[in-house]
Amino acid sequence: MPKPPDYSELSDSLTLAVGTGRFSGPLHRAWRMMNFRQRMGWIGVGLYLLASAAAFYYVFEINETYNRLALEHIQQHPEEPLEGTTWTHSLKTRLLSLPFWFWTVVFLIPYLQMFLFLYSCTRADPKTVGYCIIPICLAVICNRHQAFVKASNQISRLQLIDT
């Protein structure tokens, strides 16, 4: 059981008002048991989720504008391309014709990869950081498969000695 702080030795009133800065409880014990990388990982996860909430709000506001622009684009009759049309206008019309789910998938994959990387930083074992990123995951799986094949080949070459 933690000992209550002795306020008789505190000299200034601010320290007396705030206390010693030591908190007790399971959350504080868990926080103290983590190393620096894990703490920064959890702070990163929290900030990432907070920024994600703000970004999702912004995206859904843009979704209404995107739908309106896409509908305007579809409702227009296809006209012959004007010679004064710039490549940026042409690119904009082609990108607007892509469905919203396509843009969702394009942005969701890197989003999940970043989230899973930050989450992997919260693990106690530093060797497991980054295993959830797709290229690293594929490399680990291929390496394990090659190691398994190599080990099974070595085992098959061993001669059993019957005594």
Curated annotation (Swiss-Prot):
Species this chain originates from: Bos taurus (Bovine)
InterPro entries, alphabetized: LYSET
Recorded family membership: Belongs to the LYSET family.
Broad class of the protein's primary localization: Golgi
Localization annotation: Golgi apparatus membrane
Keyword Cytoplasm: no
Cellular component GO terms held in the UniProt record: Golgi apparatus; Golgi membrane
Assigned keywords, A-Z: Golgi apparatus, Membrane, Transmembrane, Transmembrane helix
Coiled coil spans: none
Pfam families: TMEM251 (PF15190)
Protein name: Lysosomal enzyme trafficking factor
Ranges that cross the membrane: 40-60, 98-118
Membrane protein topology class: Multi-pass membrane protein
GO biological process, one term: lysosome organization
Organism taxonomic ancestry: Eukaryota, Metazoa, Chordata, Craniata, Vertebrata
Keyword Transmembrane among UniProt keywords: yes
Function: Required for mannose-6-phosphate-dependent trafficking of lysosomal enzymes. LYSET bridges GlcNAc-1-phosphate transferase (GNPTAB), to the membrane-bound transcription factor site-1 protease (MBTPS1), thus allowing proteolytic activation of the GNPTAB. GNPTAB is involved in the regulation of M6P-dependent Golgi-to-lysosome trafficking of lysosomal enzymes. LYSET is thus an essential factor for maturation and delivery of lysosomal hydrolases.
SUBUNIT field: Interacts with GNPTAB; this interaction is important for proper localization of GNPTAB in Golgi stacks. Interacts with MBTPS1.
